[in-house]
């Protein structure tokens, strides 16, 4: 069973400055402590997140990804380490520490950080779609009239027209339910959004729409944290990748810093993105294609374009 007893802090959390929005310092999480089943899900996490960036957290199953992000919005608290969350509106940091017996301003924390779970459609429970989308904003203090406007706006943004507002969510298809559930999260208008396996169970069209949604969130100056096992999507969207292994951050960096490091890739069982694998294969066949690494193509379309460019440049020189 998870324990969250209070202990005195051994050090003060470092204040967040500039574009910093979230910091974990010495964060640990242990289940069944001091029993034969003791398991350290997190074992000393130190990392700072900044606004207007997309972070992808990757790692083998059981590496601590979901446990980490569920600390960020207060679903789990730990007796080891601290979390600092930037509250720009009130010009201070919300600090969750071993001394935190009860999180103050919990609604404010929910307003700052929201989370789209792996299958968000199972969160629907109201008798109309409008009420489902309004639930989060109203619970966090938004007036019902404003919440109704938000419901309409974000439902439309997710590709469903306003005629769905009075429909029961239980009359929708699985894909439509997911759109409604995500609209409800977006309507909270959080500064930090966490997506847990956002493309799981989606068809190619749905995956593309989800990627576009994540990229749009970044354009709105939000911090986006994505947990995924799909390395193709990591390469496509991530500004920074955090690789977890056995509850620790093994390394972090840009997608190409991670995926082109053979030592890192050999340490884990993570599959290379197809684009990187193709570059590796081409480089072995002909050294001129090593230049492709410099371009850092994100998608197959990008790769095709830079391959043509590398070939043209080679032909010009020869």
UniProtKB/Swiss-Prot annotation:
Highest taxon listed in the record's lineage: Bacteria
Amino acids binding ATP: 59-66
Keyword Hydrolase in annotation: no
SUPFAM superfamilies the record matches: P-loop containing nucleoside triphosphate hydrolases
Keywords: ATP-binding, Cell membrane, Membrane, Nucleotide-binding, Translocase, Transport
EC id: 7.-.-.-
Enzyme class at the top of the EC tree: translocase
GO cellular component, one term: ATP-binding cassette (ABC) transporter complex
Function: ATP-binding (A) component of a common energy-coupling factor (ECF) ABC-transporter complex. Unlike classic ABC transporters this ECF transporter provides the energy necessary to transport a number of different substrates.
Entry similarity comment: Belongs to the ABC transporter superfamily. Energy-coupling factor EcfA family.
Protein name (record): Energy-coupling factor transporter ATP-binding protein EcfA2
Designated gene of the protein: ecfA2
């Amino acid at each position: 069973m998870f324990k969250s007893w209070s202990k005195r802090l051994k050090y003060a959390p470092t204040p967040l400055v500039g574009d910093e929005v979230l910091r974990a310092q010495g964060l640990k999480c242990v289940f069944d402590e001091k029993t034969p089943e003791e398991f350290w899900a997190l074992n000393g996490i130190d990392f700072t997140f900044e606004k207007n960036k997309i972070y992808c957290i990757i790692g083998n199953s059981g590496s601590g990804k979901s446990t980490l992000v569920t600390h960020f919005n207060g679903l789990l608290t730990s007796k080891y380490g601290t979390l600092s969350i930037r509250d720009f509106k009130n010009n201070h940091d919300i600090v969750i520490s071993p001394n935190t017996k009860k999180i103050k301003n919990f609604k404010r924390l929910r307003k700052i950080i929201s989370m789209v779970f792996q299958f968000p459609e199972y969160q629907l429970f109201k008798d109309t779609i409008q009420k489902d989308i309004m639930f989060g904003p109203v619970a966090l203090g938004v007036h019902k009239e404003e919440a109704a406007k938000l419901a309409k706006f974000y439902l439309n943004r997710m590709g469903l027209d306003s005629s769905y507002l009075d429909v029961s969510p239980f009359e929708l298809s699985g894909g439509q339910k997911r759109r409604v559930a995500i609209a409800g999260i977006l309507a909270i208008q959080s500064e930090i959004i966490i997506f847990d396996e956002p493309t799981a169970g989606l068809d190619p069209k749905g995956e593309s729409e989800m990627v576009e949604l994540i990229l749009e969130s970044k354009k709105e100056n939000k911090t986006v944290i994505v947990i995924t096992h799909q390395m193709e999507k990591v390469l496509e969207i991530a500004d920074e990748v955090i690789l977890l292994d056995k509850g620790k951050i093994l390394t972090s960096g840009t997608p190409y810093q991670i995926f082109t490091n053979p030592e890192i890739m050999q340490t884990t069982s993570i599959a290379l993105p197809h684009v990187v694998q193709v570059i590796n294969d081409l480089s072995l066949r002909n050294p001129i294609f090593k230049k492709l690494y410099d371009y850092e193509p994100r998608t197959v379309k990008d790769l095709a374009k830079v391959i043509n460019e590398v070939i043209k440049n080679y032909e010009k020189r020869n």
